[in-house]
Amino acid sequence: MTKTYGVDVAVYQPIDLAAYHKAGASFAIVKLTEGVDYVNRRGPSRWTAPGLTTSTLMPTISRSFGSSVSRAKKEAAYFLKEAKKQDISKKRMLWLDWEAGSGNVVTGSKSSNTAAILDFMDAIKAAGWRPGLYSGASLMRTAIDTKQVVKKYGTCLWVASYPTMAAVSTADFGYFRQWTGSPSGSLPVTAWPGRRRERCSG
């Protein structure tokens, strides 16, 4: 089984990814847009490092559409417009970040939430990229029909779940084959406090 580490890079973290690669990361996920009025000007097209190629720097969208299909369409259009503007490689996955916060209402029905999520992912697929879905383990159990998502898009879930708030320096690769470090300044991947469970191959 391939063992893979990656980093989820926040906007306040260093733009030089060489240190992350040196610490063992083979992919990075970087925020591109949020809603329909924010673009990360330190986005994926500006991040480079030896070993972290155009196919392993993957943009995300932070959402605020909740269970609204019409809102999901607008956010997808905004996201894709920026992805094209930044000339994001079609080899990369584009990720939908659907979780509580930033105005995103997660209290809709599981079916309506899933319909909006799939509509967003469908737009990514139609534009020529492979879509992925990021959310917390709790929401994936209670608010999203992940079976329906996986049935349509295969291995595409990035699951946020922390086994403990204490530092975790090794990942359980018997559980998932890819892991990302949690955000904590510029600490090496192997020293970050906690791991996000990862089910998606890049």
Curated annotation (Swiss-Prot):
Q: What is this protein called?
A: Lysozyme
Gene3D superfamilies named in the record? Glycosidases
Molecular function (GO) terms for this protein are:
lysozyme activity
* Active site (UniProt): D8, E99
Which domain of life does the protein's organism represent? Answer: Viruses
Q: What does this protein do?
A: Helps to release the mature phage particles from the cell wall by breaking down the peptidoglycan.
The alphabetical list of record keywords is: Antimicrobial, Bacteriolytic enzyme, Glycosidase, Hydrolase
Identify its protein family.
Belongs to the glycosyl hydrolase 25 family.
Q: Which reaction does it catalyse?
A: Hydrolysis of (1->4)-beta-linkages between N-acetylmuramic acid and N-acetyl-D-glucosamine residues in a peptidoglycan and between N-acetyl-D-glucosamine residues in chitodextrins
Can you supply a Gene Ontology BP term from the record? Answer: killing of cells of another organism
Regions annotated as coiled coil: none
Question: What organism does the UniProt record list as the source?
Answer: Lactococcus phage mv1
Question: What's the name of its gene?
Answer: lysA
PANTHER family assigned:
LYSOZYME
- Whether Lipoprotein counts among this entry's keywords is no
- EC no. given is 3.2.1.17
Q: Enzyme class, one word?
A: hydrolase
